[in-house]
Amino acid sequence: MRILMLSSTFPYPPSRGGTEIRTFNLLRYLRHSHDITLLTQRHQDVTDADVEELKKWVSHLLIFALPAEPIPQKGMSGLFAKAGRFIESVAKATPVNVLHRYSPEIQDLVDSYVREGKCDVITCEHSVNEIYIRPEFRHRVNTVVDIHSSVCGWTRDHLEMGASPHPLRDRLSLALILKRYEKKYSSKFSSIVVTTEDDRQEFIKLRPDIKIEVIPNGVDLELFPYRSNDPGGTNLSFVGAMDASHNIDAARFFAIEILPELQKHHPDITFSIVGARPTPEVLELKNLPGVIVTGKVDSMVGYLHQSIISVIPLRTGFGIKNKTLEAMAAGLPVVGSDRALEGLAVDSNNLPLRALRANHKDEYVTAISQLLENPQLRSELSQNAREYVETEFTWESAGRRYEKVLL
């Protein structure tokens, strides 16, 4: 099968973020049996070594420049520029960031591949790539969008939890752009792939005529080996890219609202915020007692293995979370929110207990205290979680299911 894969996000190294992890690992599975041409865009953090490494995993790698960010303008000219971009976004029912990343050169190449019959299937790795798919393509070639997460659900979540940094803008965007956008682009594709049942329910309203496949993320079990022992102690960890709004909100929520309450009962408890690119809002948390902000680390799994519990206090964000699966694979007991545990059967009736659920301050305090004081419960969650990931959430399993959609 000749696959034309579109990924505006440069998918290497597969540790930079959730989009990179999912795209690379699905690509890695497919390349064993299929010819893959990858079209991607290079941002300033991509090194020549990254490019050379990615070339090893595809048949053809075509790299395009990522447009420069608009230069901020002050005063009225800046307001007019922002208003102009927003009006264009409303008129085209397409988010500003999607329009900004659009490359006419990529469009010309995609058009030529379809016109000349040079591919059997086109995959869009994340919905942002849908902009290159013309509605008529699906009559000539199989077109698949792997959505990763619903932008409507994501934005609505941020607004409901008060986590949006620009609530007025996001309310307008949700009402005037995003709902129309998801309806418009979902109609173009032969097949739709999502990562969770929640996202499937979002899109089944828009495309009741096709089967929407749920393919959850996986974990590279070699990169996240099961820890050899319970380290004990009182160090909690939260991992992720610390410039992402949902992670910023989660880190601040836990450090400011939950940790002080825990410290009343466990004075020695510490909270490590582990991940690259911490913003000023995250960095200032290290001034709080017991909070450690590491920035980028050489080994994420090393920090996980040194922690007694992984806390994942996400209040926003749709889609299955790599950080949850990775912590479970590494053998950490997990205390997470509904958003952190989305798509995972961790505390259902008649199933082994695989994580503890908490959404409010008192629930976090109770669950974490329970685990700190009960080594047997920690061991139970650790073993059950690892077995669950090994059975249900490997990239090989996800790749097999994705391949069936593409065929």
Model-identified regions with their sequence ranges:
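A short, well-ordered alpha-helix in the C-terminal region of glycosyltransferases
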Residues: 370, 377-391, 401
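Acidic donor-binding loop of glycosyltransferase active sites
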Residues: 190, 290, 305-319, 330-332
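Donor nucleotide-sugar binding/catalytic pocket of nucleotide-sugar-dependent glycosyltransferases
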Residues: 63, 142-145, 152, 171-179, ...
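N-terminal subdomain of nucleotide-sugar transferases
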Residues: 1-65, 117
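Conserved nucleotide-sugar donor-binding subdomain of glycosyltransferases
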Residues: 76-131, 166-188
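Conserved catalytic-core segment of nucleotide-activated headgroup transferases in glycan assembly
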Residues: 214-289, 293-306
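Short hydrophobic beta-strand element within catalytic cores of glycosyltransferases
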Residues: 323-326, 333-340
